[in-house]
Amino acid sequence: MKKTILSLQHLLAMFGATVLVPILTGFDPSVAIFCAGIGTLIFHTCTKGVVPAFLGSSFAFIPVILAAKEAHNGDLAYAQGGIIVAGLIYLVMSAIIKKIGVDKIKKYFPAQVVGAMIAVIGLNLIPTALDMASHNFIIAVITLGSAVAINVFGKGFVKQLNIIIAVAIGYIISLMLGNVDTSFMSSSASFLQIPAFRLPKFSLEATVLIAPVVLAVFMEHIGDMTTNGTVVGKNFIEEPGLHRTLMGDALATIAAGFLGGPANTTYGENTAVLAITKNYDPSILRRTAICAILLACVSKFGGFLQSIPTEVMGGISIMLFSMISYVGLKTINDSKCISNKKNIIIVLTIMIIGLGTTYLGNKGIVIGIPITKTVTITGLSLAAIVGIILNRVLNRNEFKVEKKEEQSVLNSQLV
């Protein structure tokens, strides 16, 4: 019972974003939720069930899905085909990483790079939370204040339930003020429903539009896995391995493409729930996945979740996204890396590019590395690439030392 209640908190955290992507692109929200649940179970199978992560609809694919949809007269089946190919590219990348070894990848992601990337993920999400809260700041503040108060003064299991209790408080107040759409209760729709699954179609045009996005979301995946590992206190890049987490993401995305949903990706919102509750049991996320699958088939429950006011979710999201930023800054501080001026430059560069390009992008000014006419590496992905290269240049002496050590080990093995 305890784990089931905790899983509902993760369900609340992922619901808004997972439903928003299909609403923006035209996919069926019920199918998207179903795919999120199936994708999460696939991911946990691939990662030996040790990574407490939840997969939901990816925002990175929105512009290219819309472009593919427009190119095929509104037929999203071709976008599904492109999503499947993107997942296959993910699988190839997973195999390459397994071949060359994670150690050669890991040295390019020291604390000054990883910490700054994590902080950028959280800080870029906070404006979205504030926009949601702006629907009714009073209710948002009450919801946020309730979560903070329970987190500070709560004890034991009650403290772990701070998110779901805060949402309940915000929901009840909104209900009393008449701010909740209760039409789902009187709807004549049947209690159970089968999601409207749809088979994919393939075209070269849709594939060329969508597939290159994996180059951008690969960096986001590393950031998400590093954030998750930092919160839990484990190195998931090393064990179960980046190749396994990528494979899980790839197969989840392929499954979504075949079922008729948007591409899947690991969710920072659920990592923030882990940070707040301090409960890192991966089985709770698997229960959340099962709940999501059931939710996709129960129209009334889905209606209830969709009736939660935007401002209530905005208030909670402020706390969730702030926690992600805190984890990033804590990673930088704990490593003592900023005692080196070169590392300060790296941290600031990543944060300026990551936040600056996202801000300008919202103003219609796109700065980044163009991959295709519709795909540009910008925001976090661009910041990560620049940060990795800058770290390689400024700290090149450390790389030389590591190379000498590797050569010494190789020579000793030959002898």
Locations of the language-model features?
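Hydrophobic alpha-helical segments within and immediately flanking transmembrane helices
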Residues: 34-42, 56-70, 116, 165, ...
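Membrane-embedded alpha-helical modules
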Residues: 74-184, 289, 294-403
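Short, non-helical or kinked segments that cap or interrupt transmembrane helices
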Residues: 27-32, 49-61, 105-114, 159-164, ...
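Membrane-embedded helical hairpins/re-entrant loop segments and their flanking transmembrane helices
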Residues: 26-44, 212-282
